[in-house]
Amino acid sequence: MRLNTLSPAAGAKSAAKRVGRGIGSGLGKTAGRGHKGQKSRSGGGVRVGFEGGQMPLKIRLPKFGFTSRRALVSAEVRISELAKVNGDVIDLNALKDANLVTRNIQFAKIVLSGTIERPVTVKGLKVTKGARAAIEAAGGKIEE
């Protein structure tokens, strides 16, 4: 076997269908588009969601909900990620310096996921009940 003798398995490749190339091809004349109508024309077609003038489903259904603007500037931090923070005091700036949250984040909450080995002091961050218990069990404390 040599590189110049390699070829795809039989039946693995099929030639592209050439449309509009005579009656004998099976896809001549109308080229599989049928007769007349918007979809048969060059550049013809309708936008996504268009239902031929009938009121579209997207508009027939009621609006609901909204996008919370606070969610755009809030983040959750796992307790296992706190090991990446240098120093014993963890606040929002320390999380940003450790690249655990992005620069535009204004609120952060520490959640229980994983374990924490060293004692740390958490300042000015929200902490869930489970995370609070884990931090205090490791010898750390939470300051509001």
From Swiss-Prot:
PANTHER family: 50S RIBOSOMAL PROTEIN L15, LARGE RIBOSOMAL SUBUNIT PROTEIN UL15M. The lineage of its organism: Bacteria, Pseudomonadati, Pseudomonadota, Gammaproteobacteria, Alteromonadales. Keywords: Ribonucleoprotein, Ribosomal protein, RNA-binding, rRNA-binding. It comes from Shewanella piezotolerans (strain WP3 / JCM 13877). Pfam families: Ribosomal_L27A (PF00828). Part of the 50S ribosomal subunit. Residues 21-31 have a biased composition (Gly residues). Belongs to the universal ribosomal protein uL15 family. Binds to the 23S rRNA. The keyword Membrane does not apply. GO terms for cellular component: cytosolic large ribosomal subunit. One of its GO terms (biological process) is translation. NCBIfam families: rplO_bact. Residues 1-49 are annotated as: Disordered. SUPFAM superfamilies: Ribosomal proteins L15p and L18e. HAMAP family: Ribosomal_uL15. One of its GO terms (molecular function) is structural constituent of ribosome. This is Large ribosomal subunit protein uL15.
